[in-house]
């Protein structure tokens, strides 16, 4: 784990707080003590009245809240650029093969998680909300590997166990009828964990890691998606979320196939299904939320849910365009995520914000409604903080908040000339201007290096481990190719259904 933070003074920074008053100073100090901001302003250092362990001269640098990657799957970190463009249902067939039998080693899980965390820190991303899946089953060892990686990297991480527990063909419409008896039998026999086994793993995650390292590491819960779990497991997760005030990750209506599934299996939308179970609440971060109707949006707003928008992933998989304006009008808070490295192929949250902003210009001709830079900056920071149940002390620079800060060089091409700081942060910055990343008051990245980590050695090890991983994927891909015609038929049939809306541009 990283060494404990003591005290740090950031001097002479251009400060963008993104607080309730959106305060900005062209030259100010930020005083940090025991991982939290204690004073901010032109004379914050003098007002503190104590010596600092370190003073950082930030002349020419912008200090802003660290970015929050609100939706991520670390197990995809080895798969950047590995798969062609497929719709989600076909994509997942290759990504998480339903008949997979071999698991990843704990060392592989550690290294791939670590590499992703370091890439985020280099871009000024100080927090990640990791919906970590485990193939074929979750174990204490795989949970520990992921959490230790985040502990050692120095990033703030909230982590869930994303583990479906129903048979593969029941997750989709029409698929059971398309498969042969032998194929269904093989899926029936595939490893699958019980409600009791999964809740026991959650108990371990919470007891061992929730609140660790001064609260930098924490637990969330995840059902993956409502159609992928049994009702008793779903209810058990909801109870855990309420008892410990944990975020609840839930993918809902990411694709048209899922809209059709809700109608076919439950006779209602998946949002209405969750609501009718009595499980829709303010702890839920609803991921993707593309194929929503007006009733769904009203239910999300009434429940106080947050929506995680992943526009690059949505484009990569052809899932559709999220109804941003309707969600905004209903008052649904929005945060931004990269999703995983095989559906975004990077962890560049700056590019996600730019894509989210520009994509919505195609959704309305009323240009006065187009997203303003301030909306995207809020989604990059405070929106993700809310989804992580940290709205009170994360995502803004203010006394009492955790000291999660990105320092960007204003003498770069992104800000030359400096015409509009907020607009250029959203439209010009790509993470290349980040010079320092501070998490919990600790400088974890400075001037091109992650403190305390031999990145070159880590990358070498990752390349060595990736060879065996690619062989494993190659074997799985052969089975996936055999099943793909069934998934394609299912996808095309669902795509042709009239669901009363269209979220595609075509």
Positions of predicted regions on the chain:
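Active-site microenvironment of metallo-dependent hydrolases
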Residues: 1-28, 33-38, 380-506
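Metal-coordinating catalytic core of metallo-dependent amide/deamination hydrolases
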Residues: 141-289
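Glycine-enriched alpha-helix->loop->beta-strand junction motifs that scaffold or abut catalytic
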Residues: 238-247, 279-282, 299-308, 329-334
């Amino acid at each position: 784990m990283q060494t404990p933070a003591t005290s740090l003074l950031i001097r002479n920074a251009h400060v963008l707080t993104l607080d309730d008053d959106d305060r900005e100073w062209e030259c100010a100090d930020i005083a940090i003590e025991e991982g939290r901001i204690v004073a901010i302003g032109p004379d914050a250092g003098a007002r503190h009245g104590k010596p600092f362990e370190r003073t950082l001269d930030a002349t020419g640098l912008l200090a802003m809240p660290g970015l929050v990657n609100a939706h991520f799957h670390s197990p995809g970190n080895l798969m950047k650029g590995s798969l062609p463009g497929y719709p989600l249902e076909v994509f997942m067939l290759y990504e998480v093969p339903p008949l997979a039998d071999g698991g990843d080693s704990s060392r592989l899980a550690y290294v791939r998680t670590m590499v992703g965390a370091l890439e985020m820190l280099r871009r000024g991303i100080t927090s990640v909300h990791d919906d970590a899946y485990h193939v074929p089953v979750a174990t204490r060892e795989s949970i520990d590997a992921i959490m230790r990686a985040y502990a050692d990297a120095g990033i703030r991480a909230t982590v869930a166990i994303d583990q479906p527990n129903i048979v593969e063909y029941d997750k989709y419409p029409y698929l059971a009828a398309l498969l042969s008896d032998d194929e269904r039998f093989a899926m029936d026999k595939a490893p699958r964990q019980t409600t009791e086994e999964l809740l026991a793993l959650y108990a371990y995650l919470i007891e061992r890691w929730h609140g660790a390292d001064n609260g930098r590491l924490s637990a969330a819960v995840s059902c993956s998606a409502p159609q992928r779990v049994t009702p008793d497991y779903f209810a058990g997760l909801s109870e855990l979320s309420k008892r410990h005030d944990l975020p609840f990750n839930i993918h809902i209506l990411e694709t048209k196939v899922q809209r059709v599934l809700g109608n076919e299996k439950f006779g209602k939308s998946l949002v209405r299904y969750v609501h009718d179970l009595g499980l829709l609440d303010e702890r839920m971060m609803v991921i993707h939320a593309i194929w929503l109707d007006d009733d769904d949006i009203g239910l999300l707003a009434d429940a106080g849910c947050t929506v995680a928008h992943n526009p690059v992933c949505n484009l990569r998989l052809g899932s559709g365009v999220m109804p941003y304006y309707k969600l905004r009008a209903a008052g649904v808070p929005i945060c931004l995520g990269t999703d995983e490295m095989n559906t975004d192929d990077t962890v560049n949250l700056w590019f996600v914000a730019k894509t989210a902003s520009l994509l919505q210009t195609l959704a309305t001709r009323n240009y006065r409604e187009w997203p303003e830079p301030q909306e995207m900056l809020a989604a990059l920071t405070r929106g993700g903080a809310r989804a992580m149940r940290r709205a009170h002390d994360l995502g803004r620079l203010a006394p009492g908040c955790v000291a999660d800060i990105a320092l960007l060089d204003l003498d770069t091409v992104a800000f030359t000339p400096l015409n509009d700081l907020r607009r250029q942060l959203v439209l010009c910055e790509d993470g290349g201007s980040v010079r320092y990343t501070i998490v919990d008051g600790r400088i974890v990245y400075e001037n091109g290096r992650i403190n305390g980590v031999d990145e070159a050695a880590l990358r070498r090890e990752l390349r060595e481990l990736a060879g065996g991983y690619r062989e494993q994927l190659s074997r799985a891909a052969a089975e996936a190719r055999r099943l793909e015609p069934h998934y394609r038929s299912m996808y095309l049939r669902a795509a042709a259904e009239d669901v009363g809306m269209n979220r595609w541009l075509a």
